[in-house]
Amino acid sequence: MNKERYIGIMSGTSLDGVDVVLCEIDKKSCLLKASVEYPFPDDLKKEILSMINGKCTLAQVGSVDVRLGILFSDAVNALLEIEKIDPKSIKAIGSHGQTLWHEPVGKYPFSMQLGDPSAIAVRTGIKVVADFRQKDMALGGQGAPFAPAFHAFLFGGTDASVSILNIGGMANITVLGKTLLGYDTGPGNVLMDMWVAEHKDVTYDRNGEWARSGEVIYPLLEAMLEDPYFSQPHPKSTGREKFNEAWLQKHLNAQHSTLNAHDVQRTLLELTAVSISNEVLKFNQDILLLCGGGAKNAFLVERLGTLMPNIQIGIANDADNIEAMTFAWLAYKRLHNEHVDLKDVTGARQNAILGGVYV
């Protein structure tokens, strides 16, 4: 069967840019052919962060939905122009959207992503697949994470026991085996990025160097690790609606002492490393492949190696683009009416065809 061309769009909880990828996909492979990281406007980022903190109006939700749709379409068109690609050669765009709120538990669980897919379809001239999470949640699932299904497609078929760790704003683990498992371990980069932005006027702590200059505040670390999320059994998923500025400030206030900013950064890095290693070590895996922005944090990777000395840790191929590739692949699955194997990951009653199609 001939390979088909799909585009994937991902904008994660870190809000550091829009990742757009071009993939060639068939039943056995998904090959990355091109990618671009499109800048996220500062004013839009600030507005979304304000909305995620629970302060927004219906008018804001509507206008930001359209603004994001325009931003995502501009990002796609930039890739097409750079690579000199005819839009007619693309079967579909898979768009994750920008998560505004993820509420997987309660009487009426939901997950809200913004980024009007109709606007993307009109402005690019390409069919769009979006709204992936809703069907899974209607079937009783968490609606996240979805990457494990793609990880199994991409990295499965080996005799070695392999886990994949994606470190984005949140961190999620995929455990490959007879039964596919995957869930969010907790915060990835989100708290570190938030803290360094507040104190250093940069968007992230390059290579974890600022964290490296500090010392762990153990009472703070222990208090944060007592959060019920970390002991909650999987399936589970989380986001900025849980691990955010208010959550961190609550723990800082409880220390009743003046804390050095670089020591807090060091402690936040340790929180990410320990919460990840606590989960990875449950599965007795031989190999851990890292992807996502956190894979470029040298000090975080170093700490993971120290906490898990018997596991071979490496960086996955195309590590920066695997999340966006996931949604290109999910678009392929939708257009071919193929079920996505996620019920053991999300807790849904059955596997399903995911996503709505916008033309």
From Swiss-Prot:
Keywords, alphabetical: ATP-binding, Carbohydrate metabolism, Kinase, Nucleotide-binding, Transferase
Pathway field: Amino-sugar metabolism; 1,6-anhydro-N-acetylmuramate degradation; Cell wall biogenesis; peptidoglycan recycling
Main EC class the enzyme belongs to: transferase
Record-level Gene Ontology MF annotations: ATP binding; kinase activity; phosphotransferase activity, alcohol group as acceptor
Chain residues that bind ATP: 12-19
InterPro entries referenced in this protein's UniProt entry, alphabetically: Anhydro_N_Ac-Mur_kinase, ATPase_NBD
Superkingdom per UniProt: Bacteria
Catalytic activity: 1,6-anhydro-N-acetyl-beta-muramate + ATP + H2O = N-acetyl-D-muramate 6-phosphate + ADP + H(+)
Annotated GO biological process: 1,6-anhydro-N-acetyl-beta-muramic acid catabolic process; amino sugar metabolic process; peptidoglycan turnover
Keyword Transferase appears in the UniProt entry: yes
EC number: 2.7.1.170
Family: Belongs to the anhydro-N-acetylmuramic acid kinase family.
Protein role: Catalyzes the specific phosphorylation of 1,6-anhydro-N-acetylmuramic acid (anhMurNAc) with the simultaneous cleavage of the 1,6-anhydro ring, generating MurNAc-6-P. Is required for the utilization of anhMurNAc either imported from the medium or derived from its own cell wall murein, and thus plays a role in cell wall recycling.
Protein name: Anhydro-N-acetylmuramic acid kinase
Organism: Sulfurovum sp. (strain NBC37-1)
